[in-house]
Amino acid sequence: MKAFGKSLSVLCLAWLLALAGSVGGASSALAAAPKITLPGKNVDAATTAKLPSKAVPPPKPVLVPPAGNLVIIGGGLRADNAEVWQRIVSLAGGKGARIAVFGMASVNPEKSGQSIINKLNQYGAQAFFVPLGVTLPNSDYRKAAEDPEIVALIHSATGIYFAGGDQARITQALVRQNGHRTAALEAIWDVYRDGGVIAGSSAGAAIMSTTMFYDAKPVLDMLKMGVNDGKEIAPGLGFIGDDVFVDQHLLVRGRFARMIPVMLKKGYQIGLGIDENSAMVVDSRRDVEIIGYSGALLIDLSSAITDRGVKGFNISNAAISYLDRGDKFNLVTRAFTPSPDKADNKLDPNQPDMREPVFTNDILGNNAVLDLMGNLIDNAQQEAIGIAFGNPRDPYPDLGFEFRFSKTVNSVGYSSTEAEAYSVLKLRLDIRPIQLQQPLYRYK
């Protein structure tokens, strides 16, 4: 599989370069290593080539899409979640597949890595530990990341697994101080380009987009005080591409709300947030399939606007969807395919199951947004409201936020014939700041 993927990539690249003409010395896509600026690191100006002031910019290198797959896990993956574990092993080549396990996000990489190895091997893999990590005892992680033996070890794999922990440790170990990829990271990309699978859970999911959460504040504080490069967010490794933002632990921790200010700041139109014990499988055609226990939220800001005249974070006309297990979504065409148990059970807006108003006073609570969306899509009501506010002792205790969800002509729902579950597409979402009375309540 690796040889075939590599040959196909080279042939595609040669054909595209022939059509484009001479590239004037532009780097090959397979060798290109975009610079990543790490928080708190100053890149030497000498590492950046300068063009003459009147030079014609060189053509961009032709990018060949990776032939592999991503398995983006929302954290909390149980050992008995056979659907996810088996999919990772299958995408790596099936029984006996060699999967390189990186425990570098953990304080104890070896312990974390061995736990993952045991689970992968239980499902038929031949997983092995890669001795690379900032916190790995008696090891220089910078030398290890350039070590030819470690690079060869990675190249011997058809799958990669990043365990959970602190995602900053992953990028610190795999990205040079000048912002370029280490030899180990290039080898990981080679596995992916040649048709292998990259899986990651929690912190291992956070690194999948070009921007990741770094030292993030609580969700509500992020809405109140904003996000800053090098603090709340930093560069990720970008396996999913530069047009999709990824987050994890989503429904359990109400993290959908923190995705939106980051997407606005960094210019993302599409964001995907996956819940715990669940995974998004992204293939080379950019089809996303939801597997596991729960689902994912899809946030679309392509038509969203903000009002600069309003003091505080706000957004109007965002679109939010819930993709349940078994659902599929294409990141290129934006086409949605419901799971087989929902395919013939599209909700009729003229025959809603519920009629009562939908409201929650804790929209950031565990699964609160999913419950609200499911109640609204099968309801005679046209909108639902959730609010978020903090502890009276928190910063800005009188500042809260209203989340208004409303149905539009594009809103669609599907109901499962096998379980009490919904897929919900394209609800409108407006968020605006509200002022809370202080104290919030009084004794009688």
Where are these regions (language model features)?
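Glycine/threonine-rich flexible loop motifs
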Residues: 167-181
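C-terminal and late-domain segments of enzyme folds
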Residues: 34-96, 107-114, 120-122, 134, ...
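Functional beta-strand-loop-alpha-helix junction segments that form "active/interaction loops"
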Residues: 106, 112-115, 122-151
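Bacterial N-terminal signal peptides
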Residues: 10-24
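Boundary at the C-terminal end of the N-terminal hydrophobic targeting segment
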Residues: 25-32
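Catalytic-core regions built around general acid/base machinery
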Residues: 149-153, 180-195
